[in-house]
């Protein structure tokens, strides 16, 4: 039977490795998460134990194993239209405001996970175009993630009933999805055409991505150290067009991390505008 226990030292070494690779800080008591996320890789890579896997990952003996381990640790389930208010604010305030500039609107969904956020943004855009014909110029969404397997899933746009049931109304399911067989549904092409998925580690430079009008970076910063949070936020400030907006998760704040944004209360919810 494969051993799935790990020592405190192995956990500390792997934690340091993970933070160096993608900024995620595990803390002192997430051994259970490492075991649950990485145990399947022990069998996949034909290793004797989880300890062997962690040692190989930290030592850099197998690049494919390293990538798979980071991939497993950064994969998170998410919801459609999470918290609702960001998408209401997008439709009622941000899109009309940015559209007044009479140029293409560019939106970035950072750490897009399994695709629910960027596709929710795309659906919001299509609903806005239908409700207010002629309001919006061309709109494009860039969705990024560090996980190659998540990006592959996003591009396919196929979801099972469990995933579809997390925040997606029956009306939107009928409007924006088509049957994919085996109880699954696929995002329609008119939604997918709005989104370009690409790999991006938030620790790296964003300069080659260009400038955006709106950035969604929701429920991501909570995994980072204060130093990493500041780095990400300041880079995102540099990636916004003048007057651009940043949307964070409901429990996230900029306090003490950057002075490049001003808070905008939207009732409900808070967003941030580039100074």
Swiss-Prot record:
Record keyword S-adenosyl-L-methionine present: yes
Top EC group: transferase
Record-linked CDD domains: AdoMet_MTases
GO MF assignments: protein-glutamate O-methyltransferase activity
Keyword hit for S-adenosyl-L-methionine: yes
Residue ranges annotated for the CheR-type methyltransferase domain, each copy included: 1-275
A Gene Ontology biological process term: methylation
Keyword annotations from UniProtKB, A to Z: Methyltransferase, S-adenosyl-L-methionine, Transferase
UniProt-listed InterPro entries: Bact_Chemotaxis_MeTrfase (IPR050903), CheR_C (IPR022642), CheR_MeTrfase (IPR000780), CheR_N (IPR022641), CheR_N_sf (IPR036804), SAM-dependent_MTases_sf (IPR029063)
SUPFAM superfamilies, A to Z: Chemotaxis receptor methyltransferase CheR, N-terminal domain, S-adenosyl-L-methionine-dependent methyltransferases
Catalytic activity: L-glutamyl-[protein] + S-adenosyl-L-methionine = [protein]-L-glutamate 5-O-methyl ester + S-adenosyl-L-homocysteine
EC number: 2.1.1.80
Functional summary from the UniProt entry: Methylation of the membrane-bound methyl-accepting chemotaxis proteins (MCP) to form gamma-glutamyl methyl ester residues in MCP.
Protein name: Chemotaxis protein methyltransferase
Organism name: Vibrio parahaemolyticus serotype O3:K6 (strain RIMD 2210633)
Source taxonomy: Bacteria, Pseudomonadati, Pseudomonadota, Gammaproteobacteria, Vibrionales
Gene behind the chain: cheR
């Amino acid at each position: 039977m494969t051993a799935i226990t790990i020592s405190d030292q192995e956990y500390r070494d792997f934690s340091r490795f993970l933070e160096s690779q993608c900024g995620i800080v595990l803390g002192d008591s997430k051994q259970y998460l490492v075991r649950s996320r990485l145990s399947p890789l022990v069998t996949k890579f034909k290793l004797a134990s989880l300890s062997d896997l962690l040692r190989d990952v930290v030592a850099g003996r197998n690049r494919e194993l390293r990538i798979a381990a980071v991939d497993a640790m950064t994969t998170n389930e998410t919801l459609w239209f999470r918290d609702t208010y960001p998408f209401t604010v997008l439709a009622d305030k941000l899109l009309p405001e940015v559209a007044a500039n009479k140029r293409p609107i560019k939106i970035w969904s950072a750490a897009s996970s399994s695709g629910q956020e960027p596709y929710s943004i795309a659906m919001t855009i299509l609903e806005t175009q239908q409700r207010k014909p002629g309001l919006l110029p061309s709109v494009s969404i860039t969705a990024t993630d560090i996980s190659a397997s998540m990006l592959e899933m996003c591009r396919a746009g196929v979801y099972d009933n469990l995933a579809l049931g997390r925040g997606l109304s029956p009306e939107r399911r009928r409007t924006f999805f088509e049957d994919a067989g085996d109880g699954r549904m696929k995002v329609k092409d008119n939604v997918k055409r709005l989104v370009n998925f690409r790999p991006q580690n938030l620790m790296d430079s964003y300069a080659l991505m260009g400038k955006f009008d709106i950035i969604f970076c929701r429920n991501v910063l909570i995994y980072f150290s204060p130093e990493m949070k500041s780095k990400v936020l300041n880079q995102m400030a540099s990636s916004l067009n003048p007057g651009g907006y940043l949307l964070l998760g409901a429990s996230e704040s900029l306090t003490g991390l950057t002075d490049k944004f001003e808070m905008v209360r939207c009732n409900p919810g808070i967003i941030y505008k580039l100074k």
